[in-house]
Amino acid sequence: MLALLLVASIQNTIAQQDSQYTQYMYNTVSVNPAYAGSRGHVSTALLHRSQWVGLDGAPTTQTFNLHSPIGYRGVGLGLSIVNDKIGPTSETYFDIDFSYTVYTSTEGRLSFGLKGSGHLLDVRFSELNQYTSDASLQNDIENKFSPNIGAGVYYHNERFYAGLSVPRILQTLHFKDGPDPSTAKEQMNFYLITGYVWDLNDNVKFKPALLTKLVTGAPLQVDVSANFMFSEKFILGAAYRWDAAFSGMVGFNISKKFLIGLAYDREVTELGAAIYNSGSFEAILRYDFISTKGNLKSPRFF
């Protein structure tokens, strides 16, 4: 079904969106380059997302990122690799992130970030079952490369964080060849992310968060989440994607260095009622290379 929708859409202009994440609060560097190095040590994460499980050609996403501060000069560097697949289309992004941080107060930090990105696009039109022959869908696209740039700003202290970013600024056009060209345009995605950490008591922390994503040609996406952390070990939460899905989240801090997070989404649209749609699943592993010498003075919860 998704493959047929892709064929129908490709005749006109497609507004491509970035990958979707439910556990964005643990994967901020993927959408905001200014986050690179903000954890104060080398941090790496792996994420896998299977969306609309059971539907043929449904989206899947794999993400790897690694970032770290460099010395004591306020500079941070990061590397991200994102692989997206939907129907016959596969996209891979290779990102290099640079950030520079200034102190705004004793606890406050303001970071500015730049992203350099390379994009590889594969479209296997030969895998589609076409009812009618279409000349524009006869030749596969293999490893079509396009560069891009992005930018962001990120502020945080021990309790609060907020960021604004555009991971990909250039609007790349695809499928331009032929006498009657059709296009898929990679649009700018604007992100606003914010959150706070409240101590409800000595053992329970409340962590609300918000992500807003705006892209031309698509509905405004607003994700609101609420997580509760117990004894800085176990995390339980829920989220709502406006007019789209409800989510449940659970996380485990195996140690001060190692986090495991799981999420399940259920659509509230007609797609969620589809008999072959079992929902969306997401898992993230994050490891912080914290020095074993001494104690971590100010643990980060975002």
PLM segments and residue spans:
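Sec-dependent signal peptide recognition
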Residues: 1-3
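C-terminal segment of classical bacterial N-terminal signal peptides
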Residues: 6-14
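Subset of outer-membrane beta-barrel
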Residues: 16-302
